[in-house]
C-alpha cells in the first residue's frame, strides 16, 4: 500500500478502536508487515510503541523516530500453531512457551530479554 493508503488505514483503525472502546490506542500491532513509512506515520498519529517487529527479543528505541519504542513480537510463541498444525496440542504449545521462557530467563542473567505470547481468540 502506498503512504496515503497506509496513513488512512492507521487513522481508520485508530478511530474505530477509539469509537468502540472510548479511548484511542497508544500501541500498534497489525497483522500486516510494516513499510518504510509505518513508524513515521505511527508517530504522526500519536502512537508510543510499535510491535510489528520480529527482529529480536529486546525492546529498543528507533533511532529515526526516538519517540517510538519498538517492542518485538515473537511469532514462535504465538498460539497460531494450534490451528496451523492439526497435530499440535495446547499442552505442546504450553511446554514450548515454558521452555522459551526458561531459556530467555537464563539468558537474561547476562542481558535483558523479553518474551511475548500471542494468544488468539478461536
Regions found by a protein language model. Give the residues of each.
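Surface-exposed cleft-lining segments at the edges of enzyme active sites
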Residues: 24-25, 80-91, 119-122
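Catalytic alpha-helical scaffold of carbohydrate-active enzymes acting on polysaccharides/glycoconjugates
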Residues: 1-27, 32-69, 94-117
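A structural motif
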Residues: 63-81
